[in-house]
A protein has these predicted regions:
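Alpha-helix capping/helix-boundary segments
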Residues: 7-8, 38-39, 66, 86-87, ...
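Short active-site oxyanion
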Residues: 28-32, 58-59, 92-97
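Short, well-structured N-terminal submotif of metal-dependent ribonuclease cores
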Residues: 1-34, 43-55, 124
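Acidic catalytic patch
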Residues: 58-78, 89
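Acidic, metal-associated active-site segment
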Residues: 42, 81-97, 105
C-alpha cells in the first residue's frame, strides 16, 4: 500500500483511525510504502514529530529518482503535482494500491496511464 501525505499526517496526529489501519495492515502482512517527496510534504520539526519519525522507520520510503517517468505522466494528464505523479509511478512499479486523501487528483493521473492503473483508495 502506497501512503500519501494525508495518512502520514494522521499518524503524526496520533489519530485512532490511523492506528486501526496500521494494526490491520500488520495483521494482514500488508507492506507499507511512501515516498521522500511525501515525507517532505509533512515533515516540519523532528523534535515535535517523534510519532511520525518512529512510523517512518517501519515503512519503505522510496527515493525520487523517476523524474522522466513522472514528467511524462504529468504531460499526459495535463497536471503539475510532482508528488502525486511520483506516487502513481511508484504504485505502478510496485504493483500496489494507493491510499490518499486526494482521490480525484490521483485518479486523473491514473487515468492518463497507458496501461496498468493502480487502485486508489480514499483516506479516511
Amino acid at each position: 500500500m502506497i501512503l500519501d501525505a494525508g495518512f502520514l499526517i494522521s499518524v503524526d496526529r496520533g489519530e485512532r483511525t490511523a492506528q486501526e489501519f496500521l494494526t490491520a495492515a500488520l495483521a494482514h502482512d500488508t507492506p507499507l510504502t511512501t515516498t521522500h517527496p511525501v515525507v517532505a510534504q509533512v515533515w516540519r520539526d523532528g523534535a515535535r514529530q517523534a510519532r511520525l519519525a518512529r512510523f517512518l522507520q517501519s515503512v519503505v520510503v522510496v527515493a525520487f529518482d523517476d523524474g522522466p517517468e513522472v514528467g511524462n505522466l504529468l504531460a499526459r494528464a495535463g497536471t503539475s503535482d510532482v508528488v502525486d505523479a511520483h506516487l502513481v509511478v511508484v504504485a505502478v512499479q510496485r504493483s500496489e494500491p494507493i491510499l490518499t486523501g486526494d482521490i480525484y487528483d490521483l485518479e486523473s493521473l491514473t487515468s492518463a496511464l497507458p496501461e496498468r492503473q493502480p487502485n486508489v483508495f480514499n483516506w479516511p
